[in-house]
Amino acid sequence: LLVVFLGAGGALAWFTPVSAVSVEAGPSLELTLNRFDRVLQVQGNSAQDQELADKLELSYLSYTDALEAILGSQEVSQALDNGTELAVTVAGQNQQHCQDLMEDTQSCAGHGSCSSADWSQVTAAQKEGLSLSKYQMLLQLQALDPSITSEQVSECSMHQLRQWLSDLSSGQDASS
């Protein structure tokens, strides 16, 4: 009975998602992680992104190995070489664990931008059909202009979104 209980508890711990890492670099992939920082699921934001996720076979890798595989892929390397901005967003249920993930992510991501999000934003981003990084941009943009939609945001690159945010921010500052 004890062996069954421990086995069930271990399986529950292994297969329960506790954090997510969103990688936006041309292709947009979201990694769902378990408490051991292993990839449980990889979701692409488009059919092409999902093809990349399937090709890379990231399931059950450590998230740092998965992140390195994503960044080292031909598709992402080409996008970065062509000036695409890298944005990595980390979300989790435990703030300290998120901080640890952020530190590891920053060392892997190098020159890209890294941010953290609340775990509740993972579900909200999925409902909007956006990556976590783009969802955070949507929230920032909507704070300045509530008429902005998730459809508009989904059609933009992270560079375009940052420029849009900058334009809105300077426009708001100029009017105050």
Task: List the model feature ranges, each with a label.
Residues 1-19:
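Single-pass transmembrane signal-anchor helices and their membrane-water interface zones
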Residues 13-34:
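Ser/Thr/Pro/Gly-rich low-complexity linker/stalk segments immediately outside membranes or between
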Residues 34-87:
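Extracytoplasmic/periplasmic/luminal assembly and interaction segments
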Residues 85-168:
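Non-cytosolic head/periplasmic domains of membrane-anchored proteins
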Residues 169-176:
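Extracytoplasmic/luminal low-complexity segments enriched in Pro/Gly and acidic/polar residues
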